[in-house]
Amino acid sequence: VRSSAASDVYKRQEINNVFTQLVLVLADKGFISLDVEYIDGTKIESKANKYTFVWRKTVEKNRTRLLNKIRILLEQVDEAIIQENSVKDTSVELTPSMLSNIVDELKEVLEHQVTQDKEQKKALREKKKQVRELEGYRDKLMEYDNHLEVLGERNSYSKTDPDATFMRMKEDAMKNGQTKPGYNLQIGTENQFIIDFRLFPNPTDTLTLIPFFHSFQHRYNRLPGIGVADSGYGSEENYRFMQENGIEAFVKYNYFHKEQRPRYTPNPFHAESLHYNAGEDYYVCPMGQHMNRIGTRRDKTASGYITESARYKGQRCEGCPLRGSCFKARGNRIIEVNHRLNQYKRQARERLLSEEGIRHRGRRCIEPEAVFGQMKYNMAYRRFRHVGEDKVTMDFAFFAIAFNIKKMCARLRKAGKELITLAKSIFIGLFITCLLY
């Protein structure tokens, strides 16, 4: 007999399998090719109450205060009672299990203490009170540690839906930017059919692209030949992944739309506008002075990816007539340039401005956006009906299956084909593939 959690995982896998087989049947019948994937994300509200939040910063701050209270309390206890001197060392991390051992030792010592006069009895009562207080601190520390364990890499979660993260939703009736528990739903579409989906706890789209491609590969044992997404996915890590895995990236980057405006003129003082001598590795400032390389700065992203930015320093900036427009810091100007990211941006710009890129950019607006519009406004699917990632995944898998079947029937009806005959063959094929899986 399966436990409830194991049963949820099993059901999620089976429903996901049905969705995958339906998409494969659609590909077999010519509705889609699985060669191109239009990717976008939206936030769907959880069933959890919006006032059940747990914030990482609050937990960490209160936990630090609690540890200070515990150390002060331990210092107040008689040294003859404390057997473990290590707890006085601030470098030792106190844990609930360590506090439980200390409490047990204190109780054992206090049980065998003999009191003869009134003052000794009063002191004994005070020490027992401190032990009870220490027990309360131990339980509170255990609660904070449990919160941090549930949080993982996230900054918040909901008490009634621990898998949900608090995010700012597009549907903000009060217009005050209030956060609500929800999930970042990423979908991939082709010809307005949902071909892949996955839920993420982080609100930003940048960190979801690579895991989402892995989801596609897990479903279909291959990656799409073309990936199309908006500027929210345009990072160095994502561009590099697509290049190394043979995915032709039609992915915008920040300021791409701004660059395409007719009245756009680049700022001549920005690092991107300065002349760069690749052979000798130096920049030329607007006054013609060389900016020589002085080092490299390395940064780690939230996903652990290391980016490298070359640093260049100007010469004789003091007294320069263009200094006020060029920069306002003291000393000589220093710029930082990520050459690898700039190269990826140039490649992306060439693709996006090509004839094929213009076609994909036009289709992206009517691919996932159309699905989200149908889902949220025509079908009123703005909030999940269940709690927990497994059940929520099943929830959307059912929706995606129904959505694809509805879209398929509409296409058949529009094409004037014999709907019943072809639909029967599709469902029979789907049934057989699910049995053989």
Residue ranges, per PLM feature:
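Single conserved hydrophobic/aromatic residue that forms the stacking wall/gate
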Residues: 1-6, 10, 437
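Hydrophobic alpha-helical segments, especially N-terminal targeting/anchoring helices
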Residues: 2, 188-189, 277
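Residues that form generic nucleotide/phosphate-binding pockets
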Residues: 25, 69, 73-76, 109, ...
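A glycine-rich phosphate-binding loop feature that marks nucleotide/adenosyl-phosphate handling sites
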Residues: 38-43, 230-236, 258-260, 333-340, ...
